[in-house]
């Protein structure tokens, strides 16, 4: 593997078995993708095209039926590898635990020393703007704050590859923009490689070094769009003329695929 390639999908196919009286669902591929070390890569595509399936396969949550997945030159198979962190759209916080205890939960289960846990959790909560809410409970937080907590809980594991499955999907537009700025700050300061699944073309265009546009099911990449943004960027970039050109290119590819997806007669939807 080339030294700048952090993770690779090669010839990956994923097929879901048939349900009662149905047919197997060819959800993904064959698909090839190289994620470069330290890049921010977003994936857009029509509903049901296999975006989340791609993330599951890359993160070790689901095995490919064909092809191979590697992370840092090691095969990904069966379990989430050390060094990969995953954040989902759903609020995964534990309502009976404080913000601090939510962030510390995984580290405690792993048997980490108390002093190291405190140092990591304090840093993550401070970084995500939650230091003043360490003893609060999730029900006392806004939607955006709860999602920052979920990111903090992943951040304490110090992931080198961060996989995000529509983490801001349930938030309003203003909060999404602010959370996007927080995510860019996190990406710059940690140096992690990031893969983001999103339905929002503007979000993908703003945050990413590259955007992959997927086809209707079975999902493959139809276009890989290089944004050309500087590493130091924030949501103000949406006023740049190039931003409109990028989103227009994404939509020109995605529109016909979305119509195909809407008109599909298949009854089973892959994520």
Q: What is the role of each PLM region?
A:
Residues 59:
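Helix-to-loop junction immediately C-terminal to a conserved catalytic motif
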